[in-house]
Each structure stands twice: as structure tokens, then as C-alpha cells.
A protein has these predicted regions:
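Active-site residues of response regulator receiver
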Residues: 8, 58-59
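Two-component/phosphorelay signaling modules centered on CheY-like receiver
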Residues: 10-35
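Acidic, metal-coordinating helix/loop segments flanking the phosphotransfer/catalytic sites
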Residues: 36-55
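Acidic catalytic/metal-coordinating carboxylates
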Residues: 39, 66-69
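The feature encodes the CheY-like receiver
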Residues: 63
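Short amphipathic alpha-helix used as the core "switch/output" element in two-component signaling
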Residues: 68-79
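Conserved binding/recognition cores within well-folded domains
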Residues: 116-142
Length: 142
């Protein structure tokens, strides 16, 4: 089961992101558990209490702790978790990659870009958890 967090102070946008994520993963027969937060502080408290998410869909501009502050904390404490920023503020795009952000999606392109980002995330997630590894070796004959 995938654990997904959505954090956006705009309840309508958080609901839309959640609906798109549920549709995507349902069509791929993937069980997910989604937790939505309208307060970045509440998400931060849960993270400090040890709650783990595989994927976090974050807004950047929020009251209190902004998305960049959340991303830094997540990057430092849950390096395997993936972050997708969904924002109206494109000016933070370069800085966002300092925290290994997986994708940066403008809210105006959400319907087109989020399913593609989720597809790419799911492929990577599957590869990272695969039970099979390819080991390249060089054959040396003596």
C-alpha cells in the first residue's frame, strides 16, 4: 500500500489533487492511503511523530511553514520519500531541486501534468522495491 500526503491550505485544491491521485492509482489497481492536510504544521507534527509517506504532494505558499520548509525536513529525515510540488509559484522551481523534488507542477497544468508525474513516480517506486537486481559483471578469462 502506498502512503500519500497532500498538503495545501486551499481545501478545494487539496480535494482536487486527492481525487486525481485516487483515480490514477485505482486505474492501476494500486491500494493507497491518502491523508490531506490544510496546515503545514499538522503535517510537520505527524512527520516528527514518525508518520511515513511514500509520496508527498505539497503546495509551496502556505501560512506558517511553507512547502520549502517541509521539503527540507522531508529531504533530511525521509530521503526515500518523493515530493511533488503543486504550486502557482514557478519562481521557486530551481530552489526546489535542492531538496531532490521529484516534480514541480503548476496548478494551471494540474489535470495534464499530475497523471504523468504519478505514472513516473509509480514506475520508479516499483523499480526501487523490486526483488530483482541486475548486476553487471565483466568476464575476465585467464
Amino acid at each position: 500500500m502506498l502512503h500519500i500526503a497532500i498538503c495545501d491550505d486551499d481545501a478545494w485544491m487539496a480535494s482536487k489533487v486527492e481525487a486525481l491521485a485516487k483515480i490514477f492509482f485505482r486505474t492501476h489497481c494500486v491500494d493507497i492511503k491518502v491523508q490531506s492536510y490544510q496546515s503545514s504544521e499538522n503535517l510537520m507534527y505527524d512527520l516528527q511523530d514518525g508518520v511515513y509517506y511514500d509520496l508527498l504532494l505539497l503546495d509551496i505558499e502556505m501560512p506558517g511553514i511553507d512547502g520549502m520548509g517541509l521539503a527540507k525536513n522531508i529531504h533530511d529525515n525521509m530521503p526515500a520519500a518523493r515530493i511533488i510540488f503543486i504550486t502557482s509559484h514557478l519562481e521557486y522551481a530551481i530552489t526546489a531541486y535542492e531538496f531532490s523534488v521529484f516534480r514541480y507542477i503548476p496548478k494551471t497544468a494540474l489535470d495534464d501534468k499530475l497523471p504523468v508525474a504519478l505514472e513516473d513516480f509509480y514506475k520508479l517506486y516499483g523499480l526501487e522495491r523490486s526483488e530483482y537486481y541486475v548486476i553487471k559483471v565483466k568476464l575476465i578469462l585467464c
